């Protein structure tokens, strides 16, 4: 591969050769654009729109449009895109990922493809990782777009519905990945189409694309309401778990990030909970709580995985070190941590709507992204999102010196060496950014530096508010900044003249992350736009990466050398062992994400069907034909599932059939068994359908045609939503137990697809039955008005969200329970065949 690259160039170099002629055309138009008057810019925008309407393609107008934006930026904000930024703009317009190093002006680059694609009138979303960056980037670039006659909006967390509609109605909309995703989910829960805020998803430019599409890929967006389970069991399970002895009663698997009971632990559980067989299916509730309590107490670490703030457990993002306000671990883990830490245990939530970032962003017509580090994950971008990665050349050559890793035997020796290095460089005034992997480590290092009298600033999840301000001073002379991982990403570190003379920004990594990309991001904070700088990672054999994934061979060599804890090793073998450990973890994580996507694709296809149908109900005014089809399906399926063809059971079956339909849509005693006992199956269907349709027609006359249409719409939407929420829960439970199928020589993914599909079919029938039932039992005093309905859900990311009333869960019949209609058959073989 290396030889081929030398002959033909890398993939990026080959692709850039195709982009260069386009950029030459853009640059050639520079003089023409400079001759335009200010008022001509808006006229050019109108001209482009008109050309597109007449059939020209975006690529036809691209050189001229890019040249126009370039000149507009120069006149409004005093910045002119240089050649490399124009290349980046073309790559993004083509629906690719542009790898642009820190400080190369990604925010300015985005204006080029955003403007061109906004000319279609279908909207462009520019996605950033937090509200601060979304607002900052919008404020910085708005003068450029407005000068060109385009409207630009920003979606912030605290906006109301009208403000969101206005922002999404703009030509270009800035916002965070979570706001865009949650708005999509909320739009699919509204009762009136006027309440929707988003348009169809057209073109998205994702800033820090690796962070959003890879690091966050496993994080589902969940809108939840409050569940109804008691929280007491979490406290009991916590009390039991704290009485256990490590290794004897339970074991911890660090690679899998889990803990499980040993045989001895199981015996203790049976005695404590007074059950005969802990593994019994009827004890699943106990198992669930114990597993989560074990994980909370012995796997999850305070100030690394979560932190406590004002009596609340906040998740700490493992990639950015930021506190994820309002986000909660799912599946009861958050409650188990609350019980462990002795804070108030909140009730488990019920999922009302959910989607992963993977599936949300794959819905855009065109997707592109920017980041400083994407190449290590190129395969994943290509395989999952169909995006290729193009490395954009830097404007100035990178002058940063990346030193080899220094490896120590113990963590204590490593931190002593880090402090010595900081003290040494502090004396000559060189600014330093020290990256740590957890709050705990950053605070430990901070106290060591205090003892040495080195002034410094700490940036971690606890001080999130000051993040941008702290990071903006990190390039000043003699400034030492300790930051958890990638905190402050998106804010440039600019060097002062004195700092530059002292050697530029020194990056010190206190531990290798399990992903090479995160390490590269930390390195990339130094050496922006040709600035001087330096980087070095300090590693110990006690670090998580080396301990869990490193090779025992290294440990053996170190032991043979008999190194003291503060003696360092610099060797190629150790460096390559670290890299292979990282590759191992990256491969492992990619496989996990791929498998999760296979599972998520099942429910994603189902979600698409439900949301598409829901949208049609919202848009369509008249559902009469659909309702009549539902009535026919309910009646016909009821007849098919109740009548077996066994003569001696015929009368009983007819009675059960009539009872069943009386519960749904027939008035009592309207149809008697004797009226239908001499008819064939087909005649019974027609007779019953005629009776039900007559009632429907009568109801329509009583209530009024306009009102009944509105009632049908509201009932159908409510039933779809309720059944879909229950289905999400059911699919979740199915997924949790599906791994055990491997023991039965079954492919778990195939089993999940097959059973999930069956459950979906059942849900569709349930929707029909319940819609008909509610419609035939509705009594109207006053017509429902088309007014703004109160939201009954809260998003799980919103710390200020109002506490909602618990959703009442209907008593649901198990598939293997006896059917309530009295037939003596199992529910799944009787009414359950259609419900």
Curated annotation (Swiss-Prot):
<dbReference type="Pfam" id="PF07516">
    <property type="entry name" value="SecA_SW"/>
</dbReference>
<dbReference type="InterPro" id="IPR000185">
    <property type="entry name" value="SecA"/>
</dbReference>
<keyword id="KW-0479">Metal-binding</keyword>
<protein>
    <recommendedName>
        <fullName>Protein translocase subunit SecA</fullName>
        <ecNumber>7.4.2.8</ecNumber>
    </recommendedName>
</protein>
<dbReference type="InterPro" id="IPR027417">
    <property type="entry name" value="P-loop_NTPase"/>
</dbReference>
<dbReference type="GO" id="GO:0046872">
    <property type="term" value="F:metal ion binding"/>
</dbReference>
<dbReference type="GO" id="GO:0008564">
    <property type="term" value="F:protein-exporting ATPase activity"/>
</dbReference>
<dbReference type="Pfam" id="PF21090">
    <property type="entry name" value="P-loop_SecA"/>
</dbReference>
<dbReference type="InterPro" id="IPR011115">
    <property type="entry name" value="SecA_DEAD"/>
</dbReference>
<keyword id="KW-0813">Transport</keyword>
<keyword id="KW-0547">Nucleotide-binding</keyword>
<dbReference type="InterPro" id="IPR036266">
    <property type="entry name" value="SecA_Wing/Scaffold_sf"/>
</dbReference>
<keyword id="KW-0653">Protein transport</keyword>
<feature type="binding site">
    <location>
        <position position="819"/>
    </location>
    <ligand>
        <name>Zn(2+)</name>
    </ligand>
</feature>
<dbReference type="InterPro" id="IPR014018">
    <property type="entry name" value="SecA_motor_DEAD"/>
</dbReference>
<feature type="binding site">
    <location>
        <begin position="103"/>
        <end position="107"/>
    </location>
    <ligand>
        <name>ATP</name>
    </ligand>
</feature>
<dbReference type="GO" id="GO:0017038">
    <property type="term" value="P:protein import"/>
</dbReference>
<feature type="binding site">
    <location>
        <position position="821"/>
    </location>
    <ligand>
        <name>Zn(2+)</name>
    </ligand>
</feature>
<dbReference type="Pfam" id="PF07517">
    <property type="entry name" value="SecA_DEAD"/>
</dbReference>
<keyword id="KW-1003">Cell membrane</keyword>
<dbReference type="GO" id="GO:0065002">
    <property type="term" value="P:intracellular protein transmembrane transport"/>
</dbReference>
<keyword id="KW-0862">Zinc</keyword>
<dbReference type="InterPro" id="IPR036670">
    <property type="entry name" value="SecA_X-link_sf"/>
</dbReference>
<comment type="function">
    <text>Part of the Sec protein translocase complex. Interacts with the SecYEG preprotein conducting channel. Has a central role in coupling the hydrolysis of ATP to the transfer of proteins into and across the cell membrane, serving as an ATP-driven molecular motor driving the stepwise translocation of polypeptide chains across the membrane.</text>
</comment>
<dbReference type="InterPro" id="IPR011116">
    <property type="entry name" value="SecA_Wing/Scaffold"/>
</dbReference>
<dbReference type="GO" id="GO:0005886">
    <property type="term" value="C:plasma membrane"/>
</dbReference>
<dbReference type="Pfam" id="PF02810">
    <property type="entry name" value="SEC-C"/>
</dbReference>
<keyword id="KW-1278">Translocase</keyword>
<dbReference type="InterPro" id="IPR001650">
    <property type="entry name" value="Helicase_C-like"/>
</dbReference>
<comment type="similarity">
    <text>Belongs to the SecA family.</text>
</comment>
<keyword id="KW-0811">Translocation</keyword>
<dbReference type="GO" id="GO:0031522">
    <property type="term" value="C:cell envelope Sec protein transport complex"/>
</dbReference>
<keyword id="KW-0963">Cytoplasm</keyword>
<dbReference type="InterPro" id="IPR011130">
    <property type="entry name" value="SecA_preprotein_X-link_dom"/>
</dbReference>
<dbReference type="GO" id="GO:0006605">
    <property type="term" value="P:protein targeting"/>
</dbReference>
<keyword id="KW-0472">Membrane</keyword>
<dbReference type="GO" id="GO:0005737">
    <property type="term" value="C:cytoplasm"/>
</dbReference>
<keyword id="KW-0067">ATP-binding</keyword>
<dbReference type="InterPro" id="IPR014001">
    <property type="entry name" value="Helicase_ATP-bd"/>
</dbReference>
<dbReference type="InterPro" id="IPR004027">
    <property type="entry name" value="SEC_C_motif"/>
</dbReference>
<comment type="subunit">
    <text>Monomer and homodimer. Part of the essential Sec protein translocation apparatus which comprises SecA, SecYEG and auxiliary proteins SecDF. Other proteins may also be involved.</text>
</comment>
<feature type="binding site">
    <location>
        <position position="831"/>
    </location>
    <ligand>
        <name>Zn(2+)</name>
    </ligand>
</feature>
């Amino acid at each position: 591969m290396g030889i081929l690259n030398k002959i033909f160039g890398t993939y990026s170099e080959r692709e850039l050769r195709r982009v260069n002629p386009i950029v030459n055309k853009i640059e050639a138009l520079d003089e023409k654009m400079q001759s335009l008057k200010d008022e001509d810019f808006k006229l050019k925008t109108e001209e482009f729109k008109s050309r597109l309407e007449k059939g020209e393609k975006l690529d036809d107008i691209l050189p001229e449009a890019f040249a126009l934006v370039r000149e507009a930026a120069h006149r409004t904000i005093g910045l002119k895109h240089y050649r490399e930024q124009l290349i980046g703009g073309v790559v993004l317009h083509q629906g690719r990922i542009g790898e642009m190093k820190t400080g190369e002006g990604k925010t300015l680059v985005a204006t080029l493809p955003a403007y061109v694609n906004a000319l279609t009138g279908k909207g462009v979303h520019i996605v950033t990782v937090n509200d601060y960056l979304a607002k900052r980037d919008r404020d910085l670039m708005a003068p450029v777009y407005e000068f060109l006659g385009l409207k630009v909006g920003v979606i912030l967390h605290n906006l109301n519905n009208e403000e969101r509609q206005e922002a999404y109605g703009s030509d270009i909309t800035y916002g965070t990945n979570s706001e865009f995703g949650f708005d999509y989910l909320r739009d699919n829960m509204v009762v009136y189409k006027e309440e929707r805020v988003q348009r169809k998803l057209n073109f998205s430019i994702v800033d820090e694309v690796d962070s959003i599409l890879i690091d966050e890929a496993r994080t589902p967006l969940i809108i939840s309401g409050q569940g109804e389970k008691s929280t007491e069991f979490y406290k009991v399970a916590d009390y039991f778990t704290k009485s256990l002895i490590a290794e004897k009663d339970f074991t911890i698997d660090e690679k899998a990030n889990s803990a499980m009971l040993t045989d001895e632990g199981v015996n203790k559980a049976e005695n404590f909970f007074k059950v005969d067989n802990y593994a019994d299916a009827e004890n699943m509730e106990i198992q669930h709580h114990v597993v989560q309590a074990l994980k909370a107490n012995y796997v999850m670490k305070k100030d690394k995985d979560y932190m406590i703030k004002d009596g609340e457990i906040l998740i700490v993002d493992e990639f950015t070190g930021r506190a994820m306000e309002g986000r909660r671990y799912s599946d009861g883990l958050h409650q188990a941590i609350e019980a462990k830490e002795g804070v108030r245990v909140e009730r488990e939530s019920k999922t009302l709507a959910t989607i992963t970032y993977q599936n949300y962003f794959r819905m855009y017509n065109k997707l592109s992204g920017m980041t400083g580090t994407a190449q290590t994950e190129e395969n994943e971008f290509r395989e999952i999102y169909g995006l290729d990665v193009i490395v954009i050349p830097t404007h100035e050559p990178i002058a940063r010196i990346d030193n080899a890793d220094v490896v120590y035997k113990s963590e204590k020796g490593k931190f002593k060496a880090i402090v010595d290095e900081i003290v040494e460089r502090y004396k000559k005034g060189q600014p330093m950014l020290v990256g740590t992997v957890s709050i705990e480590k950053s605070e430990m290092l901070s106290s060591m530096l205090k003892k040495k009298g080195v002034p410094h600033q700490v940036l971690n999840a606890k001080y999130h508010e000051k993040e941008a301000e702290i990071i903006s001073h990190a390039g000043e002379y003699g400034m030492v900044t300790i930051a958890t991982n990638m905190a402050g990403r998106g804010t440039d570190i600019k060097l002062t003249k004195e700092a530059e003379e002292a050697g530029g920004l020194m990056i010190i990594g206190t531990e290798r992350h399990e992903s090479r990309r995160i390490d590269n991001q930390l390195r990339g904070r130094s050496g922006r736009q040709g600035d001087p700088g330096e980087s070095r990672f300090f590693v110990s054999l006690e670090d998580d990466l080396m301990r869990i994934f490193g090779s025992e061979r290294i440990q053996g060599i170190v032991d043979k050398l008999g190194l003291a804890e503060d003696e360092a090793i610099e060797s190629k073998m150790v460096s390559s062992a670290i890299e292979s450990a990282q590759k191992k973890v990256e491969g492992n994580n990619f496989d996990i994400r791929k498998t999760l996507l296979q599972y998520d694709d099942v429910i994603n296809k189902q979600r698409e069907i439900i949301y598409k149908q829901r949208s049609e109900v919202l848009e369509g005014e008249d559902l009469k034909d659909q309702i009549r089809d539902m009535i026919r399906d309910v009646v016909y399926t009821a007849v098919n599932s109740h009548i077996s063809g066994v003569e001696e059971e015929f009368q009983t079956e007819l009675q059960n059939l009539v009872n069943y339909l009386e519960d749904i849509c027939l008035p009592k005693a309207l149809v008697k068994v004797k009226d239908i006992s001499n008819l064939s199956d087909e005649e019974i269907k027609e007779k019953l359908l005629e009776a039900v349709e007559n009632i429907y027609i009568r109801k329509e006359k009583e209530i009024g045609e306009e009102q009944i249409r509105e009632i049908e719409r509201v009932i159908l939407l409510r039933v779809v939503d309720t059944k879909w929420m229950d289905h999400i829960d059911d699919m979740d439970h199915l997924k949790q137990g599906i791994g055990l199928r491997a023991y039965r020589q079954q492919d778990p993914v195939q089993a999940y697809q097959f059973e999930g599909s069956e459950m979906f079919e059942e849900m569709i029938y349930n929707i029909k039955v319940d819609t008909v039932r509610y419609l035939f039992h509705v009594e109207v005093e006053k017509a429902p008005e088309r007014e703004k309905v109160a939201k009954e859900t809260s998003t799980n990311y919103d710390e200020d969200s109002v506490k909602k009333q618990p959703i009442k869960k209907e008593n649901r019949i198990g598939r293997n329970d006896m059917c309530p209609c009295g037939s003596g058959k199992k529910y799944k073989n009787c009414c359950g065949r259609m419900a």
